[in-house]
């Protein structure tokens, strides 16, 4: 059997700010051989998420940091090419923590999920946008904590991103009025015209507190926060009575490591509001419920997904940096094969 070549990107030093070329190295090794109970997966798409940048810092998080010399962690999708595990057959499509790697080993555990249906018929890009951690995060954050009701006003930051674009559409399906916050006219146009938001505020060019007052005259009932920082503070200043603030991400501080405290947090008390952080991995046992709802809405034509696709493993670091420079709309993917 010819040996398969496996190219991977490993961490060489801790980045400061954006990931620099010398922070990582592209290495070539042999693909691993599956042992009993394991299968070998050839990665087709690597998903690029802002959280992946936080795993490169030597800081405690819900997952341990990537060690120097280790493959950079990322969630991806691929096809089983060899199996010694009863849970997987050759040709199955699987979502797992592929990392920045062309091949990876999976076991029958919570880090790998077979995608139902014949492998060649699976829309892998839709799976990465809707039926993986991204879709589950939008679903559980919006339905479990946000709980939008018909007629309520929902605000979503990073509304043009992978999670935000889906979260806002879930709120629309619930009958809420949805206002996005995004950076730049092109993103704001996509948020309204593609993702179906009622309005979008351009935080780079608009006066945010004034725009929130205009678009949310009765206040904000639900805020789905992906950014933290001054944007979170501005929305906290506009909360309605009994508002729910969903803390999903803090992309504004992932590069700096600084977390300026929101001065308007006192409004949580004044408005008897709730602010709650969450991680979709806590709901792992209910992912099927999320995907069933998302599949139903997708089949009914109620969900739109968009991907920004880079080509080749060499592009992984550029794709990750692109999340922090505002380069991408929708889910960022790198196609490997």
Give each language-model segment a name.
Residues 95, 155, 201, 223-224:
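N-terminal Rossmann-like NAD(P) cofactor-binding module of classical short-chain dehydrogenase/reductase
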Residues 192, 230-303, 337:
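Glycine-rich phosphate-binding loop and adjacent beta-alpha segment
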């Amino acid at each position: 059997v010819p040996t398969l070549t496996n190219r991977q990107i490993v961490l060489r030093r801790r980045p400061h700010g954006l990931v620099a070329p010398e922070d990582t190295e592209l290495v070539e090794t042999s693909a691993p051989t599956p042992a009993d109970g394991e299968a070998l997966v050839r990665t087709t798409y690597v998903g690029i998420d802002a959280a992946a940048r936080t795993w490169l810092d030597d800081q405690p998080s819900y997952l341990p940091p990537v060690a120097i010399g280790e493959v950079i962690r990322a969630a991806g999708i691929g096809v089983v090419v060899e199996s010694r595990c009863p849970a997987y057959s050759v040709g199955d499509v699987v979502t797992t923590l592929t990392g920045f790697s062309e091949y990876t080993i999976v076991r029958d555990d919570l880090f790998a999920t077979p995608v139902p249906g014949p492998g060649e018929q699976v829309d892998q890009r839709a799976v990465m946008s809707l039926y993986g951690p991204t879709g589950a995060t939008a679903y559980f954050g919006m339905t479990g904590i946000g709980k939008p009701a018909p007629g309520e006003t929902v605000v979503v930051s990073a509304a043009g991103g992978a999670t935000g674009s889906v979260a806002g559409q879930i709120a629309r399906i619930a009958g809420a009025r949805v206002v996005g916050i995004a950076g730049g006219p092109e993103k704001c146009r996509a948020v309204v015209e593609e993702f179906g938001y009622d309005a979008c505020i351009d935080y780079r060019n608009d006066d945010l507190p004034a725009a929130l007052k205009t678009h949310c005259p009765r206040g904000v009932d639900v805020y789905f926060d992906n950014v933290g920082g001054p944007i979170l503070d501005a929305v906290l200043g506009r909360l309605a009575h009994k508002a729910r603030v969903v803390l999903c991400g803090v992309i504004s501080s992932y590069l700096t490591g600084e977390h300026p405290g929101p001065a308007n947090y006192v409004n949580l008390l004044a408005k008897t509001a709730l602010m709650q952080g969450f991680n979709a991995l806590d709901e792992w046992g209910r992912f099927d419920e999320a995907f069933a709802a998302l599949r139903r809405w997708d089949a009914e034509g109620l969900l739109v997904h968009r991907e920004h696709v880079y080509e080749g493993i060499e592009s992984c670091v550029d794709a990750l940096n692109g999340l922090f420079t505002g380069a991408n709309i929708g889910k960022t993917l790198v196609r490997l094969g």
